[in-house]
């Protein structure tokens, strides 16, 4: 007697595919790093190998399923991108990052669409959709490359801020074009749509992010493992509320992550570790599914058009966006060259390419195949070219790998928190010696982090603006509020 559920074969196939991907990835990690090829491409290749056009072990032709899974995966990838966006990155690159994430995506999409329409025999809608879906860079691919690419702080910060925040604009352009195809839209409706998407998403993300921060600051959860799960739930809440009112759920999710990452000092190590793993799992699963969905035998037919699109995208559209959005901000031609090459593509364009498939748009299969090919080629070329370009321009600048985080010590019976305090100009502790400061009872400054260097504090150590104080304090619900009030001279 045997009982088998319909989901059992799917679980078995999924487990075999995922484990194969992980172990093969581990075996080729050194070579992939040597040749600067993002590991995500391996998961795409494995999906293609196991799919209908390969070994035919797993059959997947449900674009709507892949799209829905892709949206969920992007939710967690963007949430993790927001959580890991450092306040120092925002300070260094907020303006150019915001410009590249908005106007830059539009410039990239517009120029690419114009090139597609001029060089390929397609209609304006198809050209516009191809431009829109390849308009953004991929956070996972960019972060992967930057881990082993020695870039100056400002350049690295700009790439991080841009890649973590530009997906919502590409989504908005794609959805807007499809809505225009289905319903027709005037220029005024486009402006209204964009405003609701961006402003509404920003408001929802800001509100949910602050709600998460206030709630978790005032609530001591029973288990440390509940903190990252709660943050994930707040991210899903932000997305759901935003799309319910017609705003951008992706803008809301990213902003929620930014606020939580910047303002919630408690349990940051466990929160970031959990969400990094969750985002990696989402990325692996997403690339495997996308590889299963594509038919490799159809790619040679679109090779020439896709190469033309890639050329326009990497040689014209991306540089034009970078140079336009960094004018008057002190960026030299070497930095702009590196920024142009560093705009790697990844899963987001392929997920967006499933939108025309599910909408039944004319030329949807062509769009998907072209975009898939463009992502493969652009990641290979840019991934391989980035480090030699950085070295050739004499632009190498190694950054310290250590980054401070606040952490509640997870040792049984030890009620201690290590609190991270960023010193700003409005704080009364700025410009004063440590011996002059009456720190609250039960707390002690154990380290000062300045320009990524750790200073062991003494009585004559001067506290400066932009320092990060690591303070050991007895764990209680009011410790963070008392330390903040102390730093601002309010108590």
Identify the residue ranges that each predicted region occupies.
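Hydrophobic side chains in well-ordered alpha-helices
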Residues: 142-145, 389, 433, 479-483
């Amino acid at each position: 007697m045997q009982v088998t559920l319909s989901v059992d074969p799917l679980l078995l196939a999924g487990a075999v595919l995922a484990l194969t991907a992980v172990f093969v990835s581990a075996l080729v990690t050194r070579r992939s790093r040597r040749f600067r090829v993002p590991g995500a491409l391996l998961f795409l290749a494995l999906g293609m190998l196991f799919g209908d056009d390969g070994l035919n072990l797993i059959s997947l032709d449900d674009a709507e399923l892949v799209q829905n899974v892709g949206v969920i995966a992007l939710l967690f990838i963007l949430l993790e991108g927001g959580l890991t966006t450092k306040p120092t990155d925002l300070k260094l690159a907020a303006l150019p990052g915001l410009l590249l994430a908005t106007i830059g995506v539009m410039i990239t999409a517009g120029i690419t669409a114009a090139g597609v329409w001029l060089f390929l025999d397609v209609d304006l809608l198809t050209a516009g959709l191809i431009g829109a879906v390849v308009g953004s860079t991929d956070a996972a691919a960019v972060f992967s490359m930057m881990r082993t690419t020695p870039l100056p702080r400002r350049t690295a910060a700009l790439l991080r801020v841009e890649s973590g925040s530009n997906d919502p604009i590409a989504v908005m352009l794609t959805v807007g074009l499809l809505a225009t195809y289905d319903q027709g839209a005037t220029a005024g409706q486009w402006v209204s749509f964009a405003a609701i998407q961006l402003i509404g998403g920003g408001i929802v993300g800001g509100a949910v992010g602050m709600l998460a921060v206030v709630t978790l600051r005032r609530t001591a959860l029973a288990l440390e493992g509940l903190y990252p799960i709660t943050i994930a739930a707040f991210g899903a809440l932000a997305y759901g509320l935003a799309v319910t009112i017609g705003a951008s759920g992706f803008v809301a999710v990213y902003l929620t992550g930014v606020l939580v990452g910047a303002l919630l000092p408690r349990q940051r190590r466990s929160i970031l570790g959990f969400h990094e793993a969750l985002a990696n799992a989402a990325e692996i699963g997403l690339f495997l599914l996308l590889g299963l969905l594509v038919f490799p035998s159809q790619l040679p037919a679109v090779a020439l058009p896709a190469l033309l699109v890639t050329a326009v995208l990497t040689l014209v559209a991306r540089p034009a966006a970078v140079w336009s959005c960094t004018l008057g901000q002190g960026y030299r031609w070497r930095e702009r060259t590196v920024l142009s090459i560093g705009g790697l593509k990844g899963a987001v364009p392929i997920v967006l390419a499933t939108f025309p498939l599910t909408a039944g748009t004319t030329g949807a299969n062509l769009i998907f195949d072209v975009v898939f090919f463009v992502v493969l080629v652009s990641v290979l070329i840019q991934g391989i070219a980035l480090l030699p370009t950085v070295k050739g321009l004499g632009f190498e600048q190694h950054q310290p790998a250590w980054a401070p985080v606040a952490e509640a010590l997870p040792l049984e019976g030890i009620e201690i928190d290590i609190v991270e305090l960023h010193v700003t100009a409005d704080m009364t502790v700025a410009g004063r010696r440590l011996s002059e400061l009456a720190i609250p009872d039960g707390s002690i400054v154990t380290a000062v982090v300045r320009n990524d260097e750790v200073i062991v504090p003494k009585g004559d150590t001067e506290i400066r603006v932009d320092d990060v104080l690591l303070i050991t304090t007895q764990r209680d619900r009011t410790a963070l509020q008392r330390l903040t009030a102390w730093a601002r001279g309010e108590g």
